[in-house]
From Swiss-Prot:
Keyword Electron transport: yes
Gene symbol of the encoding locus: napA
CC terms in the record's Gene Ontology section: membrane; nitrate reductase complex; periplasmic space
Signal peptide start and end residues: 1-31
Cofactor: [4Fe-4S] cluster; Mo-bis(molybdopterin guanine dinucleotide)
The protein's name in its UniProt record: Periplasmic nitrate reductase
Binding partners and assembly: Component of the periplasmic nitrate reductase NapAB complex composed of NapA and NapB.
């Protein structure tokens, strides 16, 4: 048998991956598919973070038996992180759910009953009853859905159609509200369009990298490996890392900066001031491409209106701004001097100045990266805007090696939550429900009566919790997330609503998570390559995969669940007479027929799917539903700088970065020569704005919603670790990953521990104004907080750190600040 170099690489990687996962591959021939019982290989994007690494999935006898990094993927070039290497094992936890479970007592549904196996028909029977009762008694605002940045593109699109077009409810929001909403609003305010203008190719072009609240070494390790290579093979390259505590990314930092929580706002205004004072402004760029505006201040903290902080705010939730001049902006940032910034932030002056010099030096190509440290912030939108300010002042934007780049944490937070528009205020391709023209476009595309989509923004994630608690949201479907563990302020604002007898909660999940066990009905869900899918990663790259194995037992995909459930509702049951009268041909039809089996979605026959190719959903519905939904969805953005390639193209390539025009992807947006939507001769055009100009915002420092005081004397920051992803519902079922980091710990400065009589390994009670949790003291290891701050990951279901966190949000993005609340510690005596 003769092997090519590529086949040899694939074979070696397959053997290594299989061995690491505790499996065996008898011969190299199995990896390259040359024996009768060969492993079959196919491509897919990784199931975890928003990097979008490509993997090759090895299947045999209906199971995944191996995976490896895809050497043909331009994202990861054959490399995986530790989670990626164990992808097969996330599918086969011993407690995988395989049939619907309903709380029952004496053969009937009972809110306090035990989970009992039922059929899909009976599951949909009780769902139908509860959703119809809510719609009949209170109307569309009484039903809602909490979705996911892990949904495939067509799962999110189907949910959007069912909720906003079918049930006429804008109460659809994704868990990306907790991670990317501030980035979305920041992009929209500054540029008028969402998502980064650059791409991962910037890493190999840049001279400097600045990480703002981003531990790329653990959260985006494959991108970090590319950045590490750039830094270590080019002596002039510099890396600055800013965080409220030291972490693994600090190990490569030339300028490691630990700042006082919330003072990143101060630091960015100082850098803007430094750029201006040192004549480093690109004046020609500003004159041609930038406007200046002063933003509203004292905007509150997204708490309930009765909260003292909301009552005290002068402009709660205000997104208002007014024009100003460059000279006005210069005056505004002038107060953020080096001395003042050092005092407020706790950062030495020389480090601040060194950081500012990177931005100011016209010879230095620079990329700013950020993740949750910016976004999970009560002024997260401002933080995003202020970072854009620095790139716009210097013209370091939309060009190879320079630009601001928001990294995403979920595999399709961009492709599904943002681009499809599964937020409570959005529609596809940056359209919004508050815009009449946008609603008309959606209604026309979906062949719905005019006026079907409500104009009022629906309930965002935290507002959904509050509405459940208040009894105004009564039928609620949670899909592809574990929000009971991941969301803030569990005790006060989430659990009461879920267990309220007025409400019926459905959770679709592969595993019995905290959320599933808190629900009334659990629906078993297909995972990853048990269905055909598409994700969109952080660099605007859309990637497809085919179904490669069947789902276990009676598990069904989220797409199947949404579309099948739509059959239970006739249009007369969900639309008022005036809407039905506009479309008399819809009388007697159900939402499945109107939304999913219409002449656009259903026109692609099963004959387009090879006979030997798995596609359970398509064969159940009788047409190529994924293709139909994608092509209908893609029509929203084509010709409007959100262009996607034809469906079939994506199955042949390792993803394409939109806009895709005439078969060519776009690496850098808004720059002539790279972006087909920039007219010839304009050089740069931020075409999301009517005048083609981006906006620099004057925004001040404002304090956090909650800070340490005499009683609650420590900052608490929460986050993740390398080995686990989000709430650990997948990674904790991988024995190797679980053993590597079996339980959450409380990272604390040794002197803070000593002052409280605590030692490494001690049990400690962490207490906030909202709840408490018992953890273990860790004074060493990868995370090294400064005095006055503790850090705790949220993957451990036995240590619900979100019992402690405050449900304060950015008033503009409605994204929760998981990085700043006040706690105190008590030693637990055995």
């Amino acid at each position: 048998m003769k092997l090519s170099r590529r086949d040899f690489m694939k074979a070696n990687a397959a053997v290594a991956a299989a061995a690491a996962a505790g499996m065996t591959i008898p011969t190299v021939a199995k990896a390259v598919g040359e024996t009768t019982n060969a492993i079959k290989w196919d491509k897919a994007p990784c199931r975890f973070c928003g990097t979008g690494c490509g993997v090759l999935v090895g299947t045999q006898n209906g199971r995944i038996v191996a995976s490896q990094g895809d050497p043909d993927s331009p994202v990861n070039r054959g490399l995986n992180c530790i989670k990626g290497y164990f992808l097969p094992k996330i599918m086969y936890g011993k407690d995988r759910l395989t049939q619907p479970l309903l709380r029952m007592k004496d053969g009937q549904y009972d809110k306090e009953g035990d989970f009992t196996p039922i059929s899909w028909e009976k599951a949909f029977d009780i769902m139908e009853l509860k959703f119809k009762n809510a719609l009949k008694e209170k109307g569309p605002t009484a039903v809602g859905m909490f979705g996911s940045g892990q949904w495939t593109v067509w799962e999110g699109y189907a949910a959007l159609k069912l909720l906003k077009g079918g049930f006429r409810s804008n109460n659809l929001d994704p868990n990306a509200r907790h991670c990317m909403a501030s980035s979305v609003v920041g992009f929209m305010r500054t540029f008028g369009m969402d998502e980064p203008m650059g791409c991962y190719d910037d890493i190999e072009e840049a001279d400097a990298f600045v990480l703002w609240g981003s531990n790329m070494a653990e959260m985006h390790p494959v991108l970090w490996s590319r950045m590490t290579s750039r830094r270590l093979t080019n002596a002039h390259v510099r890396i600055a890392v800013l965080s409220t505590y030291e972490h693994r990314s600090f190990e490569l930092a030339d300028n490691p900066i630990v700042f006082t929580p919330q003072t990143d706002l101060v630091i960015m205004n100082y850098i803007a001031n430094y750029i201006i004072q040192n004549n480093a402004v690109d004046k020609d760029f500003l004159a041609q491409h930038v406007n200046f505006r002063r933003g509203a201040t004292d905007i509150g903290y997204g708490l309930r209106p009765t909260h003292p902080l909301e009552k005290a705010a002068k402009n709660p939730g205000s997104d208002a701004s007014e024009p100003m001049s460059f000279e006005d902006f210069k005056t505004f940032v002038a107060e953020y001097t080096l001395e003042k910034t050092a005092k407020m932030s706790g950062v030495p002056e020389d480090q601040l100045e060194s950081l500012a010099q990177l931005y100011a030096d016209p010879k230095v190509k620079l990329v700013s990266y950020w993740t949750m440290g910016f976004n999970q912030h009560t002024r997260g939108v401002w933080a995003n805007n202020m970072c854009y300010n620095l790139h716009l002042l210097t013209g370091k934007i939309s060009t190879p090696g320079s630009g601001p780049f928001s990294l995403t944490g979920q595999p399709s937070a961009c492709g599904t939550a943002r681009e499809v528009g599964t937020f409570s205020h959005r529609l596809p391709a940056d359209m919004v429900v508050t815009n009449e023209k946008h609603r008309q476009i959606a209604e026309t595309t979906w062949q719905l009566p005019a006026g079907t989509i409500p104009e009022k923004v629906g309930l965002h994630a935290v507002a959904q919790d509050r509405a459940l608690k208040d009894g105004t949201l009564n039928a609620y479907w949670v899909m592809c997330n574990n929000n009971m563990q991941a969301g803030p302020n569990i005790n006060e604002e989430r659990m009461p609503g879920w267990r309220d007898p007025r409400n019926f909660i459905v959770v679709s999940d592969p595993y019995p998570t905290i959320s599933a066990l808190s629900a009334d009905l659990i629906l078993p869900t297909s995972m990853w390559v048990e269905k055909e899918g598409a994700y969109g990663n952080a660099e605007r790259r859309t990637q497809f995969w085919r179904q490669q194995v069947p789902s276990p037992g009676e598990a069904k995909s989220d797409l199947w669940q949404i579309v099948e459930f739509a059959k239970r509702f006739n249009v007369e049951e969900v639309w008022p007479a005036e809407l039905v009268n506009q479309k008399p041909e819809y009388r007697g039809k159900n939402l499945y027929e109107v939304l999913f089996a219409n002449d656009v979605v259903s026109k692609y026959p099963l004959s387009e799917i090879p006979d030997d190719q798995l596609n359970d959903e398509a064969r159940d519905f009788g047409f190529y539903i994924q293709k139909g939904l994608f092509e209908e969805y893609a029509s929203f953005g084509r010709g409007h700088a959100h262009d996607l390639a034809p469906f079939d193209v994506y199955h042949q390539v390792r993803g394409l970065r939109w806009p895709v025009v005439d078969g060519k992807e776009t690496l850098w947006r808004y720059r002539e020569g790279f972006d087909p939507f920039v007219p010839k001769g304009e050089e740069v055009r931020f075409y999301g704005k009517p005048d083609g100009k981006a906006v620099i915002f004057a925004l001040p420092y404002e304090p956090a919603a909650e800070s340490p005081d005499q009683e609650y004397d420590l900052w608490l920051s929460t986050g993740r670790v390398l080995e686990h992803w989000h709430t650990g519902s997948m990674t904790r079922r991988v024995p190797e990953l679980h053993r590597a980091f079996p339980e959450a710990v409380l990272f604390i400065h040794p002197l803070d521990a000593k002052a409280r009589g605590l030692h490494r390994g001690d049990k400690v009670k962490v207490i906030s104004r909202r709840g408490e949790v018992i953890s273990l003291v860790e004074t060493r290891g990868r995370n090294r907080p400064p005095r006055g701050l503790v850090y705790m990951p949220f993957f451990d279901a036995a240590q619900l750190v979100n019992n402690l966190t405050l449900d304060a949000t950015d008033p503009l993005s409605k994204e929760t600040d998981f990085k700043k609340c006040a706690v105190k510690l008590e030693r637990v005596v055995a």
